[in-house]
């Protein structure tokens, strides 16, 4: 089986790429980082450090790499069985052109073997969004063929992969936690789903997408934002602060109550899932900076993301949300000179004030009780 994976960064190499290589898939990475591509092509392998109760080093072998915008990438799409991505939500639109060209070539070559495309991104139904970008770019006469011969398969992914530590002289080495979860929508495949250990099939993907978004992502973001407020450097430092931990756990319990109501998750099992995530945040081997985890606050405060979406669920089911509100207020205080969204957030708050700014970013009614609550907590944090 041949696969092309867009995104040779830490998540691509340490998570999806590793699972594919472990399944003996013939794997090529596509990226725009030329030094990374050169290193992959000269060495054909890299190491993954898996940290937890026991630390081990795995070697991923027999890999190659091409530039994301190259004709080599187009040619690979024309012959691949699987295309996966881990590029970040905002980059999906940028790789859609290469994918569209590859699908046109595949059609013109007369290939009828199924191709499945899976976006493995921190977003809800990312592959469906990628599909829309691709379909828009297809010339007339190709769309119908693509719909018939290509599966666009949504997924939920979960593995903490921090950036490479400063001072590491190996551009390809990557550190990941032991835990990983890759759940895909089995109803969207074209042909039979591939057998890849570590890839779980479900016909109820949204339950797992929201479970991850409302728990791991919600908790991670609030830990980062409260951690920065409390002057902590890392996620571990922040979650070991009892005040931060109480709010983070409380917020995950509030969002969890929405999941239990909406999808019928077992309350005891979900409580165990929350505790598992808290222990993952405490992992002493993962040096994950609160500033990194908190970046892109405008996206994280948008209506469909990890802070506002669970809050909307609590409003829908008339459930408590005080800790989620605290997390939202802390997100509004997030600052980073390196993050354009943080700079834009600060400017919005300066120009409009917290009430109008939060309403604009989140889509919440400026005159609603929850916005008033968030503004009160925000002001109290000054």
Swiss-Prot record:
Designated name of the protein: Mannitol-1-phosphate 5-dehydrogenase
Phosphoprotein found in the keyword field: no
Record-linked InterPro entries: 6-PGluconate_DH-like_C_sf, 6PGD_dom2, Mannitol_1_phos_5_DH, Mannitol_DH, Mannitol_DH_C, Mannitol_DH_CS, Mannitol_DH_N, NAD(P)-bd_dom_sf
Binding site for NAD(+): 3-14
Biological source species: Pectobacterium carotovorum subsp. carotovorum (strain PC1)
Cited Gene3D superfamilies: N-(1-d-carboxylethyl)-l-norvaline Dehydrogenase, domain 2 (1.10.1040.10), NAD(P)-binding Rossmann-like Domain (3.40.50.720)
Family: Belongs to the mannitol dehydrogenase family.
GO cellular component, one term: cytosol
EC numbers on record: 1.1.1.17
Biological process terms in GO annotation: mannitol catabolic process
Disulfide bond found in the keyword field: no
EC class name: oxidoreductase
Record GO terms (molecular function): mannitol-1-phosphate 5-dehydrogenase activity
Pfam family, one: Mannitol_dh_C
Key words of the record: NAD, Oxidoreductase
Superkingdom assignment: Bacteria
Catalytic activity: D-mannitol 1-phosphate + NAD(+) = beta-D-fructose 6-phosphate + NADH + H(+)
